[in-house]
Amino acid sequence: MNSVVRVVLSVITAVGGFYFTYWAGGALLFAVDVNGWIELALAAVVAVGAAAFVWTRAGVPGGFLSSVGTGAIVTGTIAFVAGFFGPILLMPGANQGPLLGIFITGPLGFLLGGIGGAVSWARRRRQARL
């Protein structure tokens, strides 16, 4: 895969992973009454890990699980970022905008990306047999 595409996918994955972990994980840690820097550190670790996973997996065709995982992470992250930031940019006064990305577009993109990764793997496998 082209290096520019790999960089773009990795950056989008890092941004989406950071924000999702910060807000969803931060809400869980809020109940335990933990300092804010722990939420930031946890979100940064998850973002770097997800970006590294996408960077390595986007460069080589993998097996079934890596294809499903990469498709799910990349598509889910793009859908989450679109659903999270889209309403903020289009309707700044709406306070429920980010919830669209957290509860609807992110999980739906994750599921559809996993299915797309499985279909892509099956197509590659079928073409390799011919």
Enumerate the predicted regions with their spans.
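Small-residue-enriched transmembrane alpha-helices
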Residues: 9-22, 39-55, 63-87, 97, ...
